[in-house]
């Protein structure tokens, strides 16, 4: 067991266990029972909390979009940089995120695995998209 359950933190423990398993074993080997074992909780805990595998993977995708948004915002550079440099900074942050969060990235962009109608999923994905769109818009405005 790589992660441990702390009272009141079941959701985060299960998401962390899922990410760990995705990184080490891949999506094809992922099961709710394995996630429970990795998190050190009862085999019924993931289903009880997330409903099914899609619900759990939706939570992983939500966390991924939140992390991506944070990375993109952190890449915002001082006002002195041009819009094209700022767009490049966002591109580098995006690529770095994809390389360092492979499990999240894999789930985020495979909508068949998640519940894309989940309001939190929608909000988190739109937040990341908005940061990228703003950088692109500013770049295009500079070009005209």
Residue ranges and their predicted role:
Residues 59, 73-104, 127-129:
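Hydrophobic alpha-helical connector segments
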Residues 99-116:
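Amphipathic alpha-helical segments used for helix-helix packing
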Residues 73, 116-142:
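Amphipathic alpha-helical packing segments from all-alpha helical-bundle domains
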Residues 10-18, 35, 60-68, 72, ...:
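Generic hydrophobic, amphipathic alpha-helix propensity
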Residues 1-9, 20, 80:
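N-terminal intrinsically disordered/low-complexity leader segments
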Residues 2, 63-87, 132, 139-140:
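Amphipathic alpha-helical linker/stalk segments
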Residues 13, 17, 21-55, 59:
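Helix-turn-helix
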